[in-house]
Amino acid sequence: MTRRSRFSSLLSAFAFLAAIPFAVAGAQNTAEKQLHTLLANYETSLNAGDAGRIEQLYTVDGVFMPAGFPTASGRPAVRGAYDAVFKNIRFAIHFTLDELKVKGDFAYARTHSAGTSTVVATGASGPEADRELFIFARTRNGWKIARYLFNKAS
């Protein structure tokens, strides 16, 4: 093997190895973009009071853990919990992403939200501010919410 062909071989190997982090980063960026879209869809559905749409954003075995209310496990229970919420309260809130980490087929997002909530029966409105933790799972149908909990911001 000539010096030139050895150099070429080494250069090719180096180029291949150097490209691996970019391929991983590209996949990571794709996952992050998909998760941003999922969070935006959740926000839109929450503000629209659309429990059916929210149900579809969860995994089949998804868990919703609202502060001060029973845990809802599985899509039918999640749907029921959101239906109950929307019968009583309407939201106009915006989520801000504080942290997003992707690790393989799982990810989490830490967010905070602010806006208003309105009591359906009376029309009384007030400020709404919460902290949220979303755990996501990559499924055959894309990223879904696997676990979600929130509490009031202090």
Regions found by a protein language model. Name each.
Residues 2, 16-60:
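Short, low-complexity N-terminal intrinsically disordered segments enriched in polar/charged residues
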Residues 2-14:
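Bacterial N-terminal signal peptides that target proteins for export
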Residues 32-38, 51-103, 112, 124-127:
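A solvent-exposed, acidic/Ser-Thr-rich amphipathic alpha-helical stretch
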Residues 112-118:
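Generic short beta-strand segments
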Residues 129-154:
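Short beta-strand edge/turn micro-motifs at domain boundaries
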